[in-house]
Structure formats: C-alpha cells, structure tokens
From Swiss-Prot:
Residues 50-100, 121-171, 213-263 form the BPTI/Kunitz inhibitor domain. This inhibitor contains three inhibitory domains. The first domain interacts with VIIa and TF, the second one with Xa. CDD domains: Kunitz_TFPI1_1-like (cd22613), Kunitz_TFPI1_2-like (cd22614), Kunitz_TFPI1_TFPI2_3-like (cd22615). It is found in: Secreted. The record marks R60, A61, R131, G132, Q223, A224 as: Reactive bond. SUPFAM superfamilies: BPTI-like (SSF57362). This is Tissue factor pathway inhibitor. Glycans are attached at N141, N191, N252. It holds the Pfam family Kunitz_BPTI. Transmembrane segments: none annotated. GO terms for cellular component: extracellular space.
Amino acid sequence: MKKEHIFWTSICLLLGLVPAPVSSAAEEDEEFTNITDIKPPLQKPTHSFCAMKVDDGPCRAYIKRFFFNILTHQCEEFIYGGCEGNENRFESLEECKEKCARDYPKMTTKLTFQKGKPDFCFLEEDPGICRGYITRYFYNNQSKQCERFKYGGCLGNLNNFESLEECKNTCENPTSDFQVDDHRTQLNTVNNTLINQPTKAPRRWAFHGPSWCLPPADRGLCQANEIRFFYNAIIGKCRPFKYSGCGGNENNFTSKKACITACKKGFIPKSIKGGLIKTKRKKKKQPVKITYVETFVKKT
C-alpha cells in the first residue's frame, strides 16, 4: 500500500511539471510575435519644422501654399489663411522639396500605357477642394460609361477629362497602345488660353515620373496674372501660362528650369515607323504668339 501511494504521488508530480515547458514555449512565441510587429521609426527630417502638422492659421484668405507631409514623405498643397501658422509652409513646391523632401527617396508614380484601361480610369469621381463649377467627364467603373460631373477647378485626380470623346477614347475604348498626337501649341492673345492643334504624326509616351506632371495647365480662381510654367504632356515640353494666384493644380512651377527638372526626364518619346527630326526653336521677340513644331519623317 505504501509503495502504491509513492507511485501515484510520483505520477502527480510528473504531470504537474508538464505544463511548465508548454507555457514557456507559448511565452517565447508571444515574445517573438511582438518583436516582429514593431514598426521601424520614421526617418528624422533635416529641419525640425518639416515634421510640424499643416497649419492654415486663423485668418480667412485663400492662398495656395505647400507643406511637407512627414507620413507620406511628400510635399503637398494646402490653403493658407494669410497669417500666423508655422514654418512648415512654402510658397512653391520646389522650395518645399529643397528644404524637406530631398533627404527622402523619391516616391514616383510609374504609369505604363499599354493594352487596356489605364489605372486612373478606375478612380472615383473627385471634384477637388475648390469652388469652381466646370463641366468635366469621368469614367464610371460601375456603369462602364463616361459621365459628366462638375469639377471645382483644383486638385482631384486623373479620372478627369475636358471632353466626352477624350474620356471614351481613354477609358471606354482604349487602343492597343496609348497614343498621343504630336501637337502645335499656340497662345491665344484674347483670353490667354492654350490651343492645341493636332498634326498627323502620332507618338507614344512611356511615363516614369511624378503624377502631378500629367494634368493640364490650370489658371486657378483668382485675378492675378503671374507667369508660371507647366509640363505639357501632349508635346513633352514645359510651357508658360498665366496663373491667377490661387487654386489650380500641382503642375505649376515658378521657373522653366524647375519644370524641366521635375517632369521632362520622366517622359521617353518613341517615334512610330519613322525617324524623328528635332527642329531648332527660334526665339521671337513678339510675346503675342509662340509656336513650337516637331516634325516626323519616314525612314527611306
């Protein structure tokens, strides 16, 4: 009887020791899981003000400014009230990038126009943050048709077309390759608008650069007449336009050099079944009408 009691006592002691390794293993697994869930710290910016939150101030002006977003590592547009605020506020996109964004890897949008719809055709309708009332067209992915909407005049996204035909050609019935006609751009002296005159020579463009280089020039909503530059994605060149002083979009540069640096290197032109002859541009003294021409010829 005594031996039997000792035997069962030993069994109980052994069974009592079994859960200990199991719980230890669970703790080790739990500790390992916690370690893998830890996110690396954000990179510290060169200037402390680059990490400040956007501050439009207490006043009620409507001034376009730029700030550095520490979460996305990109310079973004905001509307400044005109007084107070903080140092994370820049007059131009280039100044913001120079002060805050140069220490971070460039985050670019890689777009390749191939067979099928471009990615931006699947974006939802976006009127932007401004208060304009401009008729535009977007591709509705639910109805599979291009539809009309009212655009505010600034920001928004690339699913935004000036004509129904342009929307249909791009998103409803895309061609095998996204082709853009070579254009002759003229400055209209009456209302300072850009008129594109297509020629017969098509070109293909492969874009590997920032998405803000793609929208057309946007004068904005105010009454000023500041000379700015925008990247014309149709002809692959930086062109001047008159900016009103507020609103507009990000395709807006204070100098031609800044425009070329940001956008021009992103486009790679390829001629179709022919050689490309680059014609020299002659500078004219008359600021009234500026014409730029590129000619295509077939190889013999």
